[in-house]
Amino acid sequence: MRLCSLTTALILLSTDGTHAAEDYCFGCHTVMEGTSLVFKDDVHYHKGLSCADCHGGDPKINDMNLSKTPETGFRRRATRETVPAYCGRCHSDPNFMAQVNPKLRVDQLALYNKSVHGRQLAAGRTEASECVDCHGVHNIRAVSDPCSPVSPAQVTETCAKCHVATAEAFRESPHGHEFTYDRRPGCVTCHASHATESATTAMLTGKDAVCVRCHKAGSDGAKTAAGIAQVLTRLETADPNAKEALARLRVAVHTFDMDAVQRAADSATVSPEAVRK
């Protein structure tokens, strides 16, 4: 992360003053909480966007009260519930995105709304992850930037902010070591980014399973996945209401170690004999 801090400093020193010269938002917010300094490191800033593109208002009026009115289109700070739609105003607009970054997909909001995180947020669970939890707020970086929290090098740590035990199990697993060596993104390789779904045994086995993308039928990896799926199915069958036990077992799945998975199953509230049948 020290390298990221150094990169930030260099960008701030090299950034031209075009935005600041035309935008009175920077005058106050540099002094108040430093938001504008952080924003100068943001991918949106470097694409020519300003505070007003998200927040509305008139940045050319040198009066805070006059610049932030309904007449100037000022928008209040987004809440957790409204952040996805807030970001989606631009990121779901193909015409706008074609001008800013035609390489970016414009279905990310639609995917998020259908995902487990999106459904939880829509159901009123405000602790569910939304855009800024993963991407940041005023210092958002391109995914290709190694300092971005959603870059291949950082994404596992970003997911770990919520999924602590699962990320720890993954880091020490064969996949964790291999992905680090190959500089491949961790969690999102299997779980996707915006279209994340609740984990099921279908991810482990079957023609549409995640595991078969890399592990051919009959390989050691495929056999391990099938064995893990069997243990999960047995516990689900033995006690469908054993939510805590199943949660612990799904964490253990990320070790990709049959012994660790079986130990987690044996520690379930139901009898080990029932799980092993």
Regions found by a protein language model. Give the residues of each.
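Bacterial N-terminal signal peptides
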Residues: 2-14
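Short sequence/structural segments immediately N-terminal
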Residues: 16-277
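Accessible peptide chain termini
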Residues: 1-2, 45
